[in-house]
Every structure is written in C-alpha cells, then in structure tokens.
C-alpha cells in the first residue's frame, strides 16, 4: 500500500525559528546595570557611568546556576531605559568604558555571551528603545543611533536566540540635560520594519519580542501566568486588549506564541530590601504550570546583586524549584504502558498510538480525516497511581486542541 500522508496543516503554523524557540520552554532573564547600584527600577538617565563598579562580577556563576536549574538560555538587559550600555558602544560615552569596572576595558555583553557558549546555553539580548539619557531621543538622530547600536549587538556577540524590545516608550528623562518629558509614536518612530529586516539578516535564528514586527508576544502580565486555553495565534499582530495577549485567539491568522516574563523577586533589578522577599517554592512551581504548562515559554528573571553575582538565596530557591519539578516528572509511567487507539490514521505505524507516549517531539498519534472524537487507551501490567499528565500537541501542523 502507498504511504499514508500526514494531516494537512491547520494554518497558521510556526516558522522554523518560532518552533525552535517554543521547544526551549524555560530560560533566564538578567536585569543588571546602573539601576542595580541606584536601588531603582527605572533610572532617569543622569547617573554617572562611574557608579557602575561590581567588585566580583562572575558570568560563569550566573550561567552555571541557570544550567543547573534547567534553563536553556539567558537574556541580558544590554541597555535599559536609563541608556547606560553594558558594552563599550562606539556610539556613546555612557557605557562601561567610562566606569571603573575592569579599568574601563570591560564588556559585560561579551563576558555573558562567552560564558553561555562555554556552558552550552543560548544567548539573547534586551535593548530598550527608550533612552532617557540620549539628548536626541524623540528626534530622527536618535533613530540612527538606535539602529547603529542594534547592529553592534547583532554582529559582535555570536548567535542570538531572541532579541527583546521593551514596550516602555517616552516620558520624562534627563535627555542630555534637557530634563523634560518627550513623547513619540512607538509604532512609527523607531523604524521597526527596518529593525526586523536587520535582525532577520544578521541573526536569522533569533525571534523578535516587542515592536511592531514581533515573532512572539507578551502574555499580558508580569505574573508568569498564561490563559486557559492559550492559543499561539492572534488576528494580525494582536490589538491592545490584554485578553488577546493572555489567551491568544482560536481563529487567529498569525502565529504569535506567548512568553511569560516574571521575576523571582518583587522587582526586576536588585534591591537589598527584597533579599527576603523571594517567590515561594510553591509559587514558582505554580508559575511553571501556568506558563509552560499552558503553552507559553517562561522567561524567569534574576536580579544580579551589586557584587555581580546571583544572590545565594536566589540560587538556593531556583535549585529547590528544579529538584521539585524533577521529582514530579521523575518516572514516566506511560513509557511502560501498552498504548492502543480506536482510530489510527490509515492504519500506519508512523501515526500509531505508541507515538503518543514515545517521548519524542517529532512523532505523534493521528486519526483519519473527519474523525473528531477518538480514544487513546493505556494499559498497565498492574494498577498505577498517576499524579501528573503531560499532554503536548504536534504544533508544526498548527494548533487544534482547545481544551483538555
């Protein structure tokens, strides 16, 4: 008999970089910069670069922690809203090159990207479009500066898996001493279509977060919570209704999967007063199930402390989290069960019930066209107590399952 064809795709479907990104599931965010030393979340842009002076910065310590916790990559705030650059940009003096750290010769973006390669983690970059330090922000001259810095980061630090544009845009700031409020139209000012072309050309494997040409979407909150059900589709690029971000749209025409960004502490940057305010183990476990367990990726933030290291309490908590999850998924009971189904596509082995429990992301059980209700049965040699069920859909063909 002839080869049984796979089910037809249900469009939209993910492109290659979106699919690779969704398979990562969890990765770390690092907020670090002048705000760390100012005890602030959003710097005004007027703090001297000399304020940045970590005494014991160790990117290997960060990455070892993330890898041990099961994270697949790291995102770094290369420049936050205050405009201070963690690399020695050729286009501004407001960077690490004018700090005492490493004698003005340091490059934190380089150190972290190199550490990621040494330890086998992917590396991504956050670049704030808003710059409260730059005197030309709000004018065309700043747009050229923004794109020049973007090209520096895209070409100087190896392969990137994600490029992050923050949604905070315009407001009061230092702006080179003007000390005023400036407003822009975020949809048109930055030239995001040009940015997309540049990123796709120089970093073809990187998904884009934010802006007007994104590959992935914000989940609509900073709590680490996706909706039930969370569709990977939206209409167009989505609108401003938070429900569209949190749940997606079942009849969407654009594949735009969700990312849950949340911090292990109350703030994104390090604050000594929050040393005893870490999220509890139970809350972190809930976050995992409410993000990854609801068809979203988890971007978990770690506010590196003033010394340049992940605080010991943060490291201990995330390792508790890892051990707890490993224990919950330690024994795959379905792997020892006999799987049968009342319908298998064309009777073909490649779509058999066994493919649903083989632990592979590239195989799946499928039914004949027109079958909208089918039964998958698992038989054990003896009674088994089940505490978790992990169900996944073969998304290269689109998203069909509305609820479980």
Give residue ranges: language-model regions.
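Mature catalytic domains of secreted/periplasmic carbohydrate-active enzymes
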Residues: 1-358, 363-370, 390-392, 399
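Well-ordered beta-strand positions in beta-sheet-rich domains
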Residues: 375-377, 403
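Hydrophobic residues in beta-strands and at strand termini
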Residues: 341, 378-382
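Short coil-to-beta strand junction motifs in C2/discoidin
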Residues: 397-404
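Extended extracellular/luminal ectodomain segments enriched in beta-structured repeat modules
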Residues: 371-373, 381-390
């Amino acid at each position: 008999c002839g080869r049984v064809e796979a089910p037809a795709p249900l469009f939209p479907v993910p492109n290659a970089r979106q699919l690779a990104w969704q398979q990562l599931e969890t990765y770390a965010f690092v907020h670090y910069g002048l705000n760390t030393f100012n005890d602030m979340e959003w710097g005004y842009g007027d703090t001297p670069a000399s304020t940045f002076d970590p005494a014991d910065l160790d990117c290997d310590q960060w990455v070892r922690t993330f890898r041990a916790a099961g994270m697949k990559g790291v995102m770094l705030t290369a420049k936050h809203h205050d405009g201070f650059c963690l690399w020695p940009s050729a286009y501004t003096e407001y960077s690490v090159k004018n700090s005492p750290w490493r004698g003005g010769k340091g490059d934190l973006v380089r150190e972290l990207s190199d550490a990621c390669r040494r330890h086998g983690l992917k590396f991504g970059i956050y670049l704030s479009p808003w710059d409260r330090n730059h005197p030309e922000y709000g004018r065309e001259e700043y747009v050229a500066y923004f794109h020049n810095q973007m090209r520096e980061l895209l070409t100087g630090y190896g392969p990137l898996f994600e490029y992050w544009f923050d949604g905070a845009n315009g407001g009061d700031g230092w702006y080179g001493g003007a000390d005023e409020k400036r407003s822009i139209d975020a949809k048109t000012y930055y030239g995001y279509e040009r940015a997309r072309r540049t990123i796709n050309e120089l970093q073809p494997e990187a998904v884009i977060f934010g802006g007007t040409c994104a590959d992935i979407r914000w989940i609509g909150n900073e709590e680490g919570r996706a909706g039930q059900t969370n569709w990977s589709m939206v209409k167009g690029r989505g609108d401003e209704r938070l429900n569209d971000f949190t749940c997606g749209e079942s009849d969407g025409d654009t594949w735009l999967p969700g990312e849950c960004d949340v911090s292990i502490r109350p703030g994104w940057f390090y604050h000594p007063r929050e040393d005893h305010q870490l999220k509890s183990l139970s809350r972190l476990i809930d976050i995992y199930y409410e993000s990854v367990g609801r068809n979203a990726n988890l971007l978990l933030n770690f506010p590196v402390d003033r010394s340049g290291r992940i605080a010991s309490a943060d490291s201990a908590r995330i390792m508790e989290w890892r051990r707890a999850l490993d224990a919950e998924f330690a024994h795959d009971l379905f792997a020892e069960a006999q799987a049968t189904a009342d319908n298998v596509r064309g009777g073909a082995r490649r779509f058999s019930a066994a493919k649903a429990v083989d632990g592979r992301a590239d195989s799946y059980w499928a039914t004949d066209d027109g079958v909208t209700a089918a039964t998958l049965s698992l038989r054990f040699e003896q009674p088994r107590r089940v505490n978790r069920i992990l169900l996944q859909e073969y998304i290269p063909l689109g998203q069909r399952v509305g609820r479980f």
